[in-house]
Amino acid sequence: MKTNLSSQIKLDRIPKRYYAPDGELELAALTRDEKVYTKIFEGSEEGSVYVAHDVAELIQKCKAEHRHCVLALGSGVGTHAVYAELVRMYQAGEVSFSNVIVFNIGEYYPLAEGAPGTMSLLKELLLVKVNIDPENIHSPGKLVSKEDVYQYCK
């Protein structure tokens, strides 16, 4: 059974109007039966940039409303290009992470001593490269006992 078919989709054989309609009317006709809004991009780079700009827009909206922006971040391969674009935007002065609170949504447990966890990857890809307050970064650590994990995550 093939599980990764996304790389086999040939958008050059499908008219662009079926996945990137020109106007609101075509978009409405194309998506009228969808229950979940979906946007299709020709490549993962374009999709990653779109998602990063969407996240940055949310951060800026929360900042304008004088409130924190709470993000739940994963560390899967699909997120790496999004984080790279967010770092680029931060370095260009397009977004600030000063009002952001981050929760790591998937940490290995128990994490062996010296083993890299998802939090170390999140830090490497994003968190140490932007101006997020370390006190606003939350992840179950190695020191949380099995009995206390639920209470910690609460």
In which residue ranges do the predicted regions lie?
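N-terminal glycine-/serine-/threonine-rich phosphate-binding loop
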Residues: 2-70
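Ligand-binding beta-strand-loop-alpha-helix segment within the catalytic cores
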Residues: 21-35, 95-154
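Acidic/polar N-terminal loop/beta-strand segments that form early-domain functional surfaces
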Residues: 41-43, 74-76, 105
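Generic structural signal for well-ordered secondary structure
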Residues: 48, 75-79, 115, 119
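Short, glycine/acidic-enriched capping/hinge loops at junctions between secondary-structure elements
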Residues: 51, 81-86, 113-115
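Generic structural signal for well-ordered alpha-helical scaffold segments
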Residues: 52-63, 87, 91, 123-127, ...
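A broadly structural signal marking compact, well-ordered functional cores
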Residues: 55, 77-79, 84-85, 102, ...
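Glycine-rich N-terminal segment of FAD-binding domains in flavoprotein oxidoreductases
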Residues: 65-92
